[in-house]
Amino acid sequence: KVEGHGTDIKISGGLQIEQNAPLSVSTIYDQTENGNGKAYVIDDEILMTSRKSVYQTLTEHEEYSRFLELLSGGDPDSTDYNLLTSQIDDKYSCVDQNIRLFETYNYTVYVPTNKAIEELHEKGVLPYWEDFDNATDPDARYRIKNRIVNFLRYHIQDNSVYIGDGSESGVKYETAKLNPANRRFYSVTVDKEGNDGMTVTDNLGRTRRVVTTEGLYNNMCREYAFDTGKNTIYTSSYAVVHLIDGALMYDEEQMEKYE
């Protein structure tokens, strides 16, 4: 993140944003006349990435709470399919909870508002995990679990996209939800408007806008996997979390009642 201009420039990495401690540029070497651009000198610490996982980021904002409840739940009889995990491949530990779908890459997590999720639940199209726990019929439990997990998967896309890093129109990104008909991942379409905002259009053609309330968008995250002694980083993934003003849907069947 870069703020200011001229000789008054402040730069922040993920860690500096978390700590609200931007770094000041002390000297600027301008070599543009020779075609080499500019070099910026920082006398303080180096730029660092975020230390917070997606899970920790979600826990710190009430506005993310309904999505977090869905992400944190799961089937106790098939934990390998739950989306949050504290251990990867039974040998790599996490700081707290990692998203199991992440694989040494960068991602975007779109979080619908609590109101949007609650409205879907009231309509009977998006169950909660308590509905799963209360169900006794195995087929019903299977339908409920799949409806929740697939809903979550469609809100996670490959590639981190931010408000403020330029403009782009009609760019498709794959999500983590697989289309069983063609064995390809469903996509979303992103339109970035520079510093003015960003919209996401789902597979049904409905457009959702990123909520640009301070602290609820562009939240940088990094998830680590350590060896069992927690002394060495085995791998890590980057992600950004945005609050959006409605849910994303990939299929009309999602709008049918699950019961």
Predicted regions and their residues:
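Mature, structured domains of secreted/extracytosolic soluble proteins
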Residues: 1-259
